[in-house]
Amino acid sequence: MLDKFLRDNLVHGEFSIGKFQFAFLDVLLTVCITGAAVMIRKAIFGISGNPGLEGGTEMLIFCVLDFVLALLMAVFVWKTTENRLKVVGVYSLAVIWPAIAGNSALNGGFEVVFAVILVALLCIIGVKKVYNMKTFWLLTIFASIFQIAQGDAPATKLTNYWPNIYTLFSETGYYNEYGYAGKLLVVGILLMVFYYISKKKEVKVTPELMVASGLFVSLFISAFYPFMNYRSGLLANVFGLLMFIQNKNKFYVPMAMCIISYVSYGYFYNGTIGVYFWMYALGLVVLMLDAGVYLYKQLQK
């Protein structure tokens, strides 16, 4: 009798909040993964040299925003897919994703605020179902501005431990010339891409197109814009996770971005790396090209 009650009401039981139905096992997984995410951040706080909570409330606020970000990503996925498994999956991945957890708990990175704003914008668009060129440009331009805002390398280096293309040549040589030229190059290419999109007579704006655009600009700017810091991959990690949830064949995008981001964290804190850093720069460029092709395909639909 008790076994049957537990099976029917807990293991196989379902609950409803409004239109959202979820199973007891979904709730159990969400609670457990949230607890694991908290413990991950607590462990990162204990790393030698990390001020953790002693550094003030700023780092704690960023860690709380990690969970807000994960919830917003789950809301966006629910509003665009209504797939319960994908909702639980994206939340679970986001709260324990190493690049996201490390950005806040290890680096105290302000970038999570940018990510929260962009995903909140996606949620508003998804809830109101206003997929049009105005909302597309709004998201794309904000993503571009937020990604550029992450550049804070010292004036004598073209990158702050982030594998952009300048690691292929010289991080310190001709930094004044490359600095100006790199900025003009990025702005010029972005304007050409935007001009091409604006001239298309018919563009079907979809959630997939919005995510593809956000991923492309975040990857492109982080790869070619000078003075990027070692935390510059957060937005690409977030958009990469959303793209993977939308298209399982893109599983390699968030995985590769997570590796690149964590290598950058390690390079910054250790001052050395076991593999040539320029190899990760090539990987970043390949991911950017792949994202560009995917964006082009979405524009043709």
Where are the language model's segments positioned?
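Transmembrane helical bundles and short interhelical boundary loops of multi-pass, membrane-embedded
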Residues: 1-22, 29-46, 109, 142-166, ...
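Loop-to-helix entry region of an early transmembrane alpha helix in multi-pass inner-membrane enzymes
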Residues: 18, 25-29, 52-71, 87-91, ...
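Membrane-water interface signatures at transmembrane helix termini and the short loops
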Residues: 20, 107-111, 191-247
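Aromatic/glycine/proline-enriched transmembrane-helix motif characteristic
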Residues: 37-38, 144-223, 298-299
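Aromatic- and kink-enriched transmembrane "portal" helix at the membrane-lumen/periplasm boundary
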Residues: 55-59, 92-112, 219-226
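Transmembrane-helix signature of polytopic, membrane-embedded enzymes
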Residues: 68-99, 129-137, 203-209
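Specific aromatic-rich, kink-prone transmembrane helix
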Residues: 75, 98-101, 113-129, 239-240
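Short hydrophobic alpha-helices at membrane interfaces in multi-pass membrane enzymes
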Residues: 115, 125-141, 213-215
